UniProtKB/Swiss-Prot annotation:
Residues 1-19 have a biased composition (Basic residues). Belongs to the bacterial ribosomal protein bL32 family. InterPro entries: Ribosomal_bL32, Ribosomal_zn-bd. GO terms for biological process: translation. This is Large ribosomal subunit protein bL32. The gene is rpmF. Residues 1-21 are annotated as: Disordered. Keywords: Ribonucleoprotein, Ribosomal protein. It comes from the Bacteria. GO terms for cellular component: large ribosomal subunit. GO terms for molecular function: structural constituent of ribosome.
Amino acid sequence: MAVPKRKMSRSNTRARRSQWKAEAPTLVKTIENGKVVYSMPHRARVIEDAAGTPLYMEYKGRKVADV
């Protein structure tokens, strides 16, 4: 395992770490019940009744799991 020869300064450490950036998630615009909804692609979504109780999960128009 490599061992640094000298201690890295706080400013150099923070400058190196500042390059680690989170990527924004890709969102897909869909229309559900007349409303525009943004969701992540290739994910199952939870179908709820009018009261907001989760019923099941759906993917590509098919029921894939019970909640």
